Amino acid sequence: MIKDSSVQVEGQEKVCLDQWVAHYRTYAAKGRSASYIPALGEINVSQLGICIVKPDGTMIKSGDWEIPFTLQSISKVIGFIAACLSRGISYVLERVDVEPTGDAFNSIIRLEIHKPGKPFNPMINAGAITIASLLPGTSVQEKLESIYVLIEKMIEKRPAINEIVFQSEWETAHRNRALAYYLKENGFLESDVEETLEVYLKQCSIEINTEDIALIGLILAHDGYHPIRKEQVLPKEVARLTKALMLTCGMYNASGKFAAFIGLPAKSGVSGGIMTLVPSKSRKDLSFQDGCGIGIYGPAIDEYGNSLPGIMLLEHIAKEWDLSIF
């Protein structure tokens, strides 16, 4: 039974979130949609929503939290986990490194000048495309099934692809094709180029909402343990490695700034989503001391491809509630 004091605290948290979402929504006009993917260019960029999930299942939601959007680069987290589960961490890291890069997420430069062909990390396009080729199965559908099964295991519902977004990405994936063929030439891509691209772009086009990614964040916050179901759904080693990569590489080439000023493991996508998490804290006087998962949606993105109002909202929350892991 929830105590009255807990209800009161959660009510205060909801009031704060509503105020902060309303405030930072006004900054959406300073961002832009990811118009290089035509289907994303049509989205209303004034939207902003958030969902916070606590270990007891309590959810605090505000703004446009329920609006569906595509995972885009947040799917790189899922793909990496799925590959590690099926191939093992050591095998995966032979083909993708774990080093941050200051280049844009779709850059090809470092593939040519450092360890030719080996992607720096799985949170950039080159790394995620390589990961897509490592997924179990011999067909596009079989490889995607490992993604679907993993997501369903965590959020308890079967994901679906937004076919309009997928077709839009498929028709404009020229840079990703260049990356894939370069990776294939250097022996890091295990599957056919076009099939691998289809897997990658379809996983990016999976549709979710802030509640879904907040649940995934909650599981990662607890090292792969699902505190609501009281079940270990991911190996601890995989969850911890994933969080480390999110912290160092998850926010494109703004990852260092994000770690310095917000201080949480996170992964963003150009659709405007941000999946982040707060590990449990040793200081029990702090807000969310038992950890939580956070999902944010704000499709107005900045020059790095991250949600502009979403990052501003998250930075405010992290400061007000002292959420940084540092």
Curated annotation (Swiss-Prot):
Q: Does the keyword DNA-binding apply?
A: no
Q: Does the keyword Protein transport apply?
A: no
Q: Which InterPro entries match?
A: Beta-lactam/transpept-like, Glutaminase
> Among the record's GO biological process terms, what is one?
glutamine catabolic process
Any matching Pfam family: Glutaminase
Q: Which Gene3D superfamilies match?
A: 1.10.1500.10, DD-peptidase/beta-lactamase superfamily (3.40.710.10)
Q: Where does substrate bind?
A: 73, 125, 169, 176, 200, 252, 270
Q: Which UniProt keywords apply?
A: Hydrolase
E.C. designation(s): 3.5.1.2
GO MF annotation, one: glutaminase activity
Identify which top EC class this enzyme belongs to: hydrolase
Which reactions are catalysed by this chain?
L-glutamine + H2O = L-glutamate + NH4(+)
Q: How would you summarize the oligomeric state and partners of this protein?
A: Homotetramer.
What family is this protein classified in? Belongs to the glutaminase family.
Q: What is this protein called?
A: Glutaminase 2
From which source organism is this entry?
A: Bacillus anthracis
The lineage, from the top, is: Bacteria, Bacillati, Bacillota, Bacilli, Bacillales
The gene behind this protein is glsA2
